[in-house]
Amino acid sequence: MRIKEHLKQLKPYQPGKPIEAVKSEYGLDKVVKLASNENPYGCSEAAKEALHHEIQQLALYPDGYSAALRTRLSKHLNVSETSLIFGNGSDEIIQIICRAFLNDKTNTVTAAPTFPQYKHNAVIEGAEVREIALRPDGSHDLDAMLEAIDEQTQVVWICSPNNPTGTYTSEGELLAFLERVPSRVLVVLDEAYYEYVTAEDYPETVPLLSKYSNLMILRTFSKAYGLAALRVGYGIADENLIRQIEPAREPFNTSRLGQAAAIAALDDQAFIASCVEQNNAGLQQYYDFAKTHGLKCYPSQTNFVLIDFKRPADELFQALLEKGYIVRSGNALGFPTSLRITIGTKEQNEEILAILAEIL
């Protein structure tokens, strides 16, 4: 047996240590995970209630077309039902896009550092990955990304807000880019953290789909909606584009539980508003801490912050781990002296910041 040569350069995704494993290893009773940008307030109670009926139907396959969720989401977004594609998390939509458009005779353009699954899936398909460095402020350099496009370019990825910096692409920048990018090139706008955005110049992207048939938007129920365990993501695009990539989607790829919970979660926008309000207050806690200690903290439009501590990130990560706080070391994210920290509850933020103050 011979595996693809380009697959040998990849490593499996390494998730953070589970809470129970950290408790056992360090003899801790309490461990707080602020590493994976999960919602510290959980999910809507309505979503939990929606699972009760579906739990009795586990012997039955889910609706492979996600019809009920499709109808509800299309109304929420004011788009046609045929403009949607669903995935086992938005990660699967990324995989579907790469399956559909990339091979060893093509290339794809992405920022760096950014969400790693764009590159990971492109490499699996054998495509060349052209990585364009972020600007000093942590945002995408769209002019440089545009210059990297050639006749073999199939897909350009824009992560906005960007993971791991939390920065975003403004409306003016995005529109200027879309006007200049060749119409034959697919532009994927990953908006996993869309619900957390409060910037006034952030673009309303869904209406742009009527003008740009080469634009695709990715969103998820894993972050603000708090349904990470159920893995429901979706893509929005021109219905012809959706029709073309649907054959690359696996059958029954979103569960009965996920579909039911997502529908209920959409109906509880008050929960989302509450989470965003508390998240904004939490962000300010970190901004104040960074200012007090003279640290660089990227302004974030997400539920996480990236702070440069000017010392090896792995050392800080380990020190926090031993105290019962799991964060994300920037060493694996392209920021070797920074930590990416999920915004927790007010109390969680206070506790971890107090520990960091002691360490500093």
Curated annotation (Swiss-Prot):
What is the catalytic activity of this protein? L-histidinol phosphate + 2-oxoglutarate = 3-(imidazol-4-yl)-2-oxopropyl phosphate + L-glutamate
> Which pathway is this protein assigned to?
Amino-acid biosynthesis; L-histidine biosynthesis; L-histidine from 5-phospho-alpha-D-ribose 1-diphosphate: step 7/9
Q: Which InterPro entries match?
A: Aminotrans_II_pyridoxalP_BS, Aminotransferase_I/II_large, HisP_aminotrans, HistidinolP_aminotransfase, PyrdxlP-dep_Trfase, PyrdxlP-dep_Trfase_major, PyrdxlP-dep_Trfase_small
Question: Which cofactor does the UniProt annotation name?
Answer: pyridoxal 5'-phosphate
Q: Which residues carry this modification: N6-(pyridoxal phosphate)lysine?
A: 223
Record carries keyword Amino-acid biosynthesis = yes
**Under which EC number(s) is this enzyme classified?**
2.6.1.9
Instruction: Please tell me which top-level EC class this enzyme sits in.
Output: transferase
Q: Which UniProt keywords apply?
A: Amino-acid biosynthesis, Aminotransferase, Histidine biosynthesis, Pyridoxal phosphate, Transferase
**Any GO BP:** L-histidine biosynthetic process
One example GO MF annotation: histidinol-phosphate transaminase activity
PANTHER family in alphabetical order: HISTIDINOL-PHOSPHATE AMINOTRANSFERASE, HISTIDINOL-PHOSPHATE AMINOTRANSFERASE 2
Record-stated family: Belongs to the class-II pyridoxal-phosphate-dependent aminotransferase family. Histidinol-phosphate aminotransferase subfamily.
Q: HAMAP family per the record?
A: HisC_aminotrans_2
> Subunit comment for this entry?
Homodimer.
Supply the name of the protein: Histidinol-phosphate aminotransferase
Name the species this protein comes from: Bacillus subtilis (strain 168)
Q: What is the lineage of its organism?
A: Bacteria, Bacillati, Bacillota, Bacilli, Bacillales
| Gene for this chain | hisC
